[in-house]
Amino acid sequence: MSGYEIFKALVNANTDYKDFEWLENNTLSEFEILISVVLTQNTNWKNVLKALINLKQANITKIEDLLNLNTQDLALLIKPSGFYNTKAKYIKNFTQKYFQDFNSFEFFKEEVDREWLLGVKGLGQESADGILNYICKKEVLVVDFYSAKIANYLGYECQSYDELAEFFKKDIAKNQNELNVLLKKECKLYELYQIFHALIVSFCKMHFQGKKLSADGVLILDPLKF
């Protein structure tokens, strides 16, 4: 079994990912996507959007605007996302480290790596990979709680985040053309990884109730079991 086979199964099942904000309905700026990587921790997307609206209304629309915003005021703006005091500290930590090491957002996107991101307090592997893939357009697949749900259901026990990512990435790069045909559009590899992540999240939200998989979900995943 491979990530490629799972990707195909989710597409063939007409899994709807078009409401995934970072893809088909991409109305968010790169700054908003960057901030949302922290805001989305331990909350739902609707609450993240409320926090982003607050930031926009306060004219906090680029990373430079965070420099003169104190942590307490930032926390109030992002309050809808929950754990707002902690998240405000994480965002300020990121901002300070960013301005120590990068002189522009374009330079950041080209030069930042996973090691640097993991050195920022508040950014874990999933958050770091989210920035690399969605902001920097790197060929990095984000895996998460939802990815682990599918892997566990299929009988795959991951021992680490990186092992889970490798499992889902398997055979996708070498079957890029076939996936583009299936999706009926030309996608670069980093875009395929974005779509795959969105498919996984959408599928799990639609078909899992806790650990229980819906009857339709069973029909989609069971043929993939080894």
Which residue stretches match the model-derived regions?
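N-terminal polyanion-binding entry modules of DNA glycosylases/AP lyases
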Residues: M1-K109, V181-F226
